[in-house]
Amino acid sequence: MHPMIPAEYISNIIYEGPGADSLFFASGQLRELAYSVETTAESLEDELDELDENWKGSSSDLLADAVERYLQWLSKHSSQLKHAAWVINGLANAYNDTRRKVVPPEEIAANREERRRLIASNVAGVNTPAIADLDAQYDQYRARNVAVMNAYVSWTRSALSDLPRWREPPQIYRGG
């Protein structure tokens, strides 16, 4: 973030934004989907074991091969879903942490309002030191917000690059 971005701009974006609830929800949905994929894989494995006991021959071998490849994909897919849920949950927590660290908009507004009030009543420069103090405080707000947002951007970029690369399910039938 540019160091001259007004402090209230960053605070307002963070405080007035949609929040992290949708990310927490998505993370939970991905965990549920991962569980569903695991359950499906276990069910298929049980069916394959039962079929293997009762059905022998080349067609049974072809089916077993196809199902085994699909089961491997399901297992990897379930792990990827869990990992994606973990990353997204981390993103939501990072957002909430950033929100806690950013200067609240009300605090910045109070600073600016007090500055305006002091300027309006600055007869013979009596309020000049107090105005300077408020300006210094505002500069600290800006620096803090920029630093917090830079850390957030850095962390989220790293986390997003850690999301899994999804693969298509294997082809069930290998023509030959």
UniProtKB/Swiss-Prot annotation:
What SUPFAM superfamilies does the entry give? PE/PPE dimer-like
Q: Which GO terms describe its cellular component?
A: cell surface; extracellular region
Functionally, this protein is described as follows:
Plays a key role in regulating innate and adaptive immune responses through human Toll-like receptor 2 (TLR2). Interacts with TLR2, leading to the subsequent activation of the mitogen-activated protein kinase (MAPK) and nuclear factor kappa B (NF-kappa-B) signaling pathways. Induces macrophage activation by augmenting the expression of several cell surface molecules (CD40, CD80, CD86 and MHC class II) and pro-inflammatory cytokines (TNF-alpha, IL-6 and IL-12p40) within macrophages. Also participates in adaptive immunity by directing Th1-polarised immune responses.
Induction field: Expressed during infection. Expressed during exponential growth in vitro.
Species assigned in the record: Mycobacterium tuberculosis (strain ATCC 25618 / H37Rv)
Q: Which InterPro entries match?
A: PPE_dom, PPE_sf
Assembly and partners are described as: Interacts with human TLR2.
Official protein name in the record: PPE family protein PPE57
Principal subcellular localisation of the protein: secreted
The protein's matches in PANTHER family, at most eight in alphabetical order, are given as: GLUTAMINE-RICH PROTEIN 2 (PTHR46766:SF1)
